[in-house]
Swiss-Prot record:
Species of provenance: Burkholderia mallei (strain ATCC 23344)
Record keyword Metal-binding present: no
Cofactors demanded by this protein: FAD
Pathway(s) the chain acts in: Amino-acid degradation; D-alanine degradation; NH(3) and pyruvate from D-alanine: step 1/1
Protein name (database record): D-amino acid dehydrogenase
GO molecular function (one): D-amino-acid dehydrogenase activity
Gene behind this protein: dadA
Binding site for FAD: 3-17
Gene3D superfamilies the UniProt entry points to: D-Amino Acid Oxidase, subunit A, domain 2, FAD/NAD(P)-binding domain
Highest taxon of the lineage: Bacteria
GO CC annotation terms, alphabetical: cytoplasm; plasma membrane
Protein purpose: Oxidative deamination of D-amino acids.
Chemical reaction(s) catalysed: a D-alpha-amino acid + A + H2O = a 2-oxocarboxylate + AH2 + NH4(+)
C-alpha cells in the first residue's frame, strides 16, 4: 500500500519506519529542511513511561489560579480570542477529576510502556545511537505536601507493574550524587529506574536514515496546503501546485494537525508552548547523571554527553513562538538551584516549541471517519516517549493486524462517540 505521512517529527518518522518495515511504500512530506526541526528539535530528552500523566489532574484548576501570581509559574494562560482555545480549556477542566485522571493516566502509561518495549527492540535490532542513557529518571519534591501527593501516581504505577523507588532526601544522592549539595532543599523523590534519556533530534535523524534504507522517501522543504477529498475519501495532498497521491494518508503534524483536518474531523489538539535551554557542562561532578524532574516548577533537567538540557513549563497562548526572557530566567534558576556549577547557563542556547496536547492528555492514534485517513498526533510532552509504540500500533492497524495493546480508546472515536461512556473523555 502506498502511504503518505505528513510530518517528519519523531512521531511521523517512527510511523514511517514501522510502516515501511511492514512492507508499505512510504513517502514523508514536511515543510522543514530535515527531520525533527520543529517540536522534536530540543525537547527535554526524556523517555519516561512511568511519568506519563495528563496535565489535567485534580487540584490543577486551583493551582492555575495561584500560578497566575508567581514569577516562576509552570503554567501561564493568555487568551487569544479564539473559541477553540476556550473550548479546549473547558474540556481540560472537565478532565481534572480523580476518576478521569486515573483513566487517562492508565491509558497513557499503557502506550508509553509499550513504546519503550518497541524502542528497546529497535535498539537491539539496529544499534541506533542518540546519546542515550538508561539510568532512570528522578522526580524531586521540595515540600512534604508534594511527597504525599505522589501517592496517587504510585497507585497507578503499582497497578501497571512499573518499578519505582520512593527516596528520602538523604537517599537522593544515591541516584544523583550532585544533589548531595542541595539535599536540605528537598524532602524526597520518586525514582523510576526503567526510564531513559537521550537526544530526540539525533534519534529522529538517525531513525529517518534507517527508514530510508527501508525505502522511505522524504520530501523536505515542501508546503502542505490541504487534503483533497473525492468520493468520501482522501484523493491527495495539495502541495503548492502539485497533488501528491497515495492509498492512505497519515497526519502526524503535531499541533498543526488540527487545522489541516478541520473540515473532515474535529480533533481537540492544541499547541502547548514549552521552552528549553541547552548548556555546556563545565563540571561533570556537579551535573546530573540522568534526568531530574523538579515537581515545583515542572522542569526536567537532562544530562547529554557534554550538555545539560533544561526544559519544561507550559503556556496556553496559541501559536505564539516568541522567546520570552522571563522563561529563560526560570530555566536557568532551576538548574542552577539544583546543580550549581554543573553547566554554563550564560552560554546556553534558548528554544521554544509547541507541544500538541489533547484535553485528556492521551494522544490520538488510529483511524478516522474518513476511510483512508489516519491520525498520529496529540502526544503532548510525551512525543518521544510514545513515538515507537504509536508508530508500531499505527502500522499494525493499517496492515490489518491486531495490535499488541488495546487501541480503541486511543483513536479519535473516543471524542466522536456518544455511547462509549466509560472510555469517552469530556469533550463538549
Amino acid at each position: 500500500m502506498r502511504v503518505v505521512i505528513l510530518g517528519s517529527g519523531v512521531v511521523g518518522v517512527a510511523s514511517a519506519y514501522y510502516l515501511a518495515r511492514a512492507g508499505h511504500e512510504v513517502t514523508v512530506i514536511d515543510r522543514e529542511a530535515g527531520p525533527a526541526l520543529d517540536t522534536s528539535f530540543a525537547n527535554a530528552g526524556q523517555i519516561s513511561p512511568g511519568y506519563a500523566a495528563p496535565w489535567a489532574a485534580p487540584g490543577v484548576p486551583l493551582k492555575a489560579v495561584k500560578w497566575m501570581f508567581e514569577k516562576h509559574a509552570p503554567l501561564a494562560i493568555r487568551l487569544d480570542g479564539t473559541r477553540f482555545q476556550l473550548q479546549w480549556m473547558w474540556q481540560m477542566l472537565r478532565n481534572c477529576t480523580t476518576e478521569r485522571y486515573a483513566l487517562n493516566k492508565g491509558r497513557m502509561v499503557r502506550l508509553a510502556e509499550y513504546s519503550r518495549d518497541c524502542l528497546q527492540a529497535l535498539r537491539a535490532e539496529t544499534a541506533i545511537q542518540y546519546e542515550g542513557r538508561t539510568g532512570g529518571t528522578l522526580q524531586v519534591f521540595r515540600t512534604q505536601q508534594q511527597l504525599d501527593g505522589a501517592a496517587k501516581d504510585i497507585a497507578v504505577l503499582r497497578e501497571a507493574n512499573v518499578p519505582f523507588e520512593l527516596l528520602s532526601s538523604d537517599e537522593l544522592k544515591k541516584a544523583e550524587p550532585a544533589l548531595a549539595a542541595v539535599s536540605h532543599k528537598l524532602t524526597g523523590g520518586l525514582r523510576l529506574p526503567g526510564d531513559e534519556t537521550g537526544d530526540c533530534q539525533l534519534f529522529t535523524t538517525r531513525l529517518a536514515a534507517l527508514a530510508e534504507q527501508l525505502g522511505v522517501k522524504f520530501r523536505f522543504n515542501t508546503r502542505i496546503d490541504a487534503l483533497a477529498v473525492a468520493g468520501g475519501k482522501i484523493a491527495g495532498v495539495q502541495c503548492g501546485g502539485e497533488m501528491v497521491r497515495a492509498d492512505a494518508y497519515v497526519v502526524a503534524l503535531g499541533s498543526y494537525s488540527t487545522n489541516l483536518v478541520a473540515s473532515l474531523v474535529k480533533i481537540p489538539v492544541y499547541p502547548l508552548k514549552g521552552y528549553s535551554i541547552t548548556a555546556p557542562i563545565v563540571d561533570a561532578a556537579k551535573a546530573p547523571v540522568s534526568t531530574v524532574l523538579d515537581e515545583t516548577y515542572k522542569i526536567a533537567i537532562t544530562r547529554f554527553d557534554d550538555r545539560i538540557r533544561v526544559g519544561g513549563m507550559a503556556e496556553i497562548v496559541g501559536f505564539d513562538k516568541r522567546l520570552r526572557d522571563a522563561r529563560r530566567g526560570t530555566l536557568e534558576m532551576c538548574v542552577n538551584d539544583l546543580f550549581p556549577g554543573g553547566g554554563d547557563t550564560a552560554k546556553a542556547t534558548f528554544w521554544t516549541g509547541l507541544r500538541p496536547m489533547t484535553p485528556d492528555g492521551t494522544p490520538i492514534v488510529g483511524r478516522t471517519p474518513v476511510p483512508n485517513l489516519f491520525l498520529n498526533t496529540g502526544h503532548g510532552t510525551l512525543g518521544w516517549t510514545m513515538s515507537c509504540g504509536s508508530g508500531q500500533l499505527l502500522a499494525d492497524l493499517m496492515s490489518g493486524k491486531k495490535p499488541a495493546i488495546r487501541a480503541d480508546d486511543l483513536s479519535v472515536h473516543r471524542y466522536l462517540s456518544e455511547t462509549d461512556g466509560e472510555h469517552r473523555p469530556a469533550y463538549a
